[in-house]
A protein has these predicted regions:
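Sec-dependent bacterial lipoprotein signal peptides
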Residues: 1-21
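Lipid interaction determinants
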Residues: 23-141
């Protein structure tokens, strides 16, 4: 009986310690690893658009933009625009060179953003137009 009395609190203590240790914030990606670790699928909001972005290991990217709002979200009336191009990272700056755009008006063919924060699952960027956007890593585009 006494052993059982001690096992339960000990088990709860172990569960509590494991739970607290798993609540640590994710470690930031070192700047020297940005180009390798940024490869993958990302989802975020840019202005009034939902944006999914795939950054490939060969330096190519594809971004899909869809307007947000009642009509777009409920009746699927919003057209999804697609932008393709190449990306590079130099220090904390990611540069996108656009090679094609479908159903999307592109002002500039080259744009750069500063990486404000980057961990395994989240990426915060500040555009050269001074807008901040946060993207979350996803499993699929």
């Amino acid at each position: 009986m006494k052993t059982n009395f001690l096992v339960k609190p000990l088990g709860l203590l172990v569960a509590l310690v494991l739970g607290i240790s798993s609540c640590k914030p994710p470690k930031p990606v070192p700047e020297s690893e940005y180009a390798a670790k940024i490869v993958g699928n990302w989802l975020g909001e840019v202005g009034h658009m939902n944006e999914s972005m795939t950054l490939n290991g060969d330096g190519s990217f594809i971004a899909r933009l869809r307007p947000r709002g009642f009509i777009s979200n409920t009746l699927s009336q919003g057209a999804t625009g697609t932008i393709r191009g190449m990306w590079t990272i130099n220090g904390k700056t990611i540069t996108l060179r656009i090679t094609s755009a479908e159903d999307e008006h592109v002002k500039d063919r080259v744009t750069s953003s500063t990486i404000l924060a980057f961990n395994q699952d989240e990426l915060s960027l500040k555009s050269d137009h001074d807008e901040t956007s946060t993207f979350s890593r996803t499993l699929s585009p």
